[in-house]
Amino acid sequence: MKRLLIGLSLAGVFLAACHTARTQSEPQVIVVPPDEMSRQPALGPSTAGSPPAAPTPATVKPSATTVSLPPPAAAPANKHSYNSCNVDGPYIAITFDDGPHAVHTPTLLDILKQRGLKATFYVVGQCAAEYPDIMKRIVAEGHEIGNHSWSHVALNSVGADSLRKQMENTNAAIKESTGLRPATMRPPYGATSARLNKLFDEEYGMKVILWSVDPLDWKNRNAATVSSRIIQNTHPGAIILAHDIHATTVAAMPEVFDTLTARGYKFVTVSELLALDRPAQLVKKETPAPTPAN
């Protein structure tokens, strides 16, 4: 009950205004044990049992520094969620949650464009509907868009109908502005379970994307702290979590991008990173890690 009240409170903030950053503290990853989830209502879309529609691939212009990728690896069987990927090479994906923001997201897009880098944006449906032009720009400049729910609620605390609306309304808003259907989603707060991960993948056709690098930028509104934490903890195959609704996070990005690029990292979208994922035993032991900072 307490978790549900927290989720409803935070959802109200998004209802008030998408362009205003949340002030509530964002909890860490919440993983509900399978036995607890089994006591909740069955979740799934009205077309349960039918195969999900294949995501429509984005058609975008190559960025100025298009990353040359190796051939895709064979998709791991029954893998519904990812915190990071096992890759041959210094490939990483940086992700931004909770936008688009009227001011900070365009600023971030400018920073990415100047460097020819790609990112993945996990958008809140209400904000996506409010800023269709920003959504179009995200796709036009080569970035990926994922589903982050309609109103930023903890999806493991809602019933079947509410979950369906959270997912489908967000997908509809994304398609309305971009013509695309997302291939991945991120549950708000990381609130998920093995059962939900399977449902999102098999019923909605979206892999669940968590993270392996978290600068806690929602809590520590300091650009230097945010950049330092990302730089120190990034590793090949990392999925980096950040939030484009915070000015301090966006201000940290030039240092993050320039330092990690100088160390040899290659920024790709989440879907590109997933395509490179392979069993750990197949990843070459000699995969070079980027040169440590002086």
Residue spans for each PLM region:
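Repetitive helical segments and hydrophobic/amphipathic motifs
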Residues: 11-12
